[in-house]
Swiss-Prot record:
InterPro entries: Ala_racemase, Ala_racemase/Decarboxylase_C, Ala_racemase_C, Ala_racemase_N, PLP-binding_barrel
Domain of life: Bacteria
Source species of the chain: Francisella tularensis subsp. holarctica (strain FTNF002-00 / FTA)
Phylogenetic classification of the source organism: Bacteria, Pseudomonadati, Pseudomonadota, Gammaproteobacteria, Thiotrichales
Pfam families for the chain: Ala_racemase_C, Ala_racemase_N
Coiled coil: none
Protein name: Alanine racemase
Residue numbers of N6-(pyridoxal phosphate)lysine PTMs: 32
Gene3D superfamilies linked to this entry: Alanine racemase (3.20.20.10), Lyase, Ornithine Decarboxylase, Chain A, domain 1 (2.40.37.10)
Encoding gene (name): alr
Length: 365
């Protein structure tokens, strides 16, 4: 059995640290992609009293949140019309991505005789989604004056927040500042928000009315940030499995597909029942590390869909079937932390955690 064990205490402590850091700004907690792989229902259930909003990528994720919490939920992505009636009935916040979408929302709201809560996404430079910057004020004005929309928020997203010195950050901030000025001229109550984790850590004066700290809440810090308070944030999860078999190699034998790993006579290998079919990175095969009984062991041979093997050498520490295996550590400096795994596989921690799928059990401890 493969289990992602999540520390409730660490999770809640991370959020409390963030809330202290951001002062009076509201906190919108992103739980998209199954709460970055940690399990959306468990994460929401254990944090809803600490945050103001939750944010997700689509309608189906939003329904999973509203099933366990009453907090406002903002959907970042495009809305699918087959779900829009349920979204409106549950007061799920819709993102307006272009001017024309306002009229479509109004028509549906009239049919339901219920107003729609909306946030307008402005493209200030990421060039992915959102109302064009040059059309922002017209769109905001139109939504604000609508009889069927409640314009609750206006937001944008930084393209280069992970590089705090990138000139695009200032360009986007300046554009957003002008939008904020226009928006606040209509109503001081409209929530303006721009920053994700890297954004409000790397840029000054960028919290506005609300921040959206996703990866930071789960315990992953940008390398550039050394603030003492924020450094108290810790990863919340460990991925664990069990040794299911010990194999002893004979002379000239190898292990796994294509037998790319060739061991020595008498070498012992531990078989672990987790593979890329569980969302664990296949690239780690033959170069990753796992922790068994506080000893690091290297992976040996190619990872398969349902399993991997690690070399125990001569097994001087007497690893046995049933021993616990730590595949992802909650200690960032360890060779099997999500940070280290991301470095080894040329990706980011978001990727490592969010691709862990439902073959892995999530357990809050």
């Amino acid at each position: 059995m493969n289990i992602l064990k999540i520390s409730k205490q660490t999770l809640r402590n991370n959020i409390k640290i963030i809330r202290e850091y951001i002062g009076n700004a509201k906190m919108c907690f992103p739980v998209k992609a199954n709460a970055y792989g940690h399990g959306i229902e468990d994460i929401v259930e254990n944090t809803h009293d600490l945050v103001d909003f939750f944010a997700v990528a689509n309608s189906l994720e939003a329904f999973r949140v509203t099933a366990v919490a009453k907090n406002p939920v903002l959907v970042f992505g495009v809305i699918y019309y087959e779900y829009i009636e349920k979204m409106i009935s549950e007061n799920i916040r819709v993102s307006i991505q272009d001017y024309e979408y306002i009229e479509k929302l109004e028509q549906i709201a009239k049919e339901l005789d219920k107003k729609v809560y909306a946030h307008i996404n402005i493209n200030t430079g990421m060039n992915r989604m959102g109302v064009d910057y040059n059309d922002a004020c017209r769109t905001i004005q139109r939504a604000y004056e609508s009889d069927w929309l409640i314009l609750e928020g206006v937001y944008s997203h930084l393209a280069c927040a992970d590089n705090r010195d990138h000139p695009t950050n200032i360009k986007q901030k300046n554009r957003f500042d002008s939008i904020v000025k226009f928006t606040k001229g209509l109503s001081q109550d409209i929530i303006c928000h721009l920053s994700n984790s890297y954004g409000f850590l790397g840029q000054k004066g960028i919290c506005y009315d609300m921040v959206r700290p996703g990866i930071l809440s789960y315990g992953f810090l940008p390398e550039f940030y050394v603030d003492r308070v924020i450094r108290e944030i810790k990863p919340i999860a460990r991925l664990l499995s069990k040794v299911v078999k010990i194999i002893t190699l004979q002379e000239g034998e190898g292990v796994g597909y294509s037998l790319i790993y060739r061991g020595f006579e008498g070498e012992q290998l531990a078989v672990i029942p987790i593979g890329y079919g569980d969302g664990f990175p296949r690239e780690l095969g033959d170069r990753g590390f796992v922790n068994i009984n506080d000893v690091m062991y290297p992976m040996a041979g190619r990872m398969s869909m349902d399993g991997l093997t690690v070399s125990l050498g001569i097994n001087e520490y007497d690893v046995k079937v049933g021993d616990t295996v730590e595949l992802i550590s909650a200690i960032p400096r360890n060779r099997n932390s999500a940070f280290s795994i991301a470095k080894q596989t040329n990706t980011i921690e978001y990727d490592i955690m969010s691709t862990l799928n439902n073959r892995i059990i999530r357990k809050i401890i």
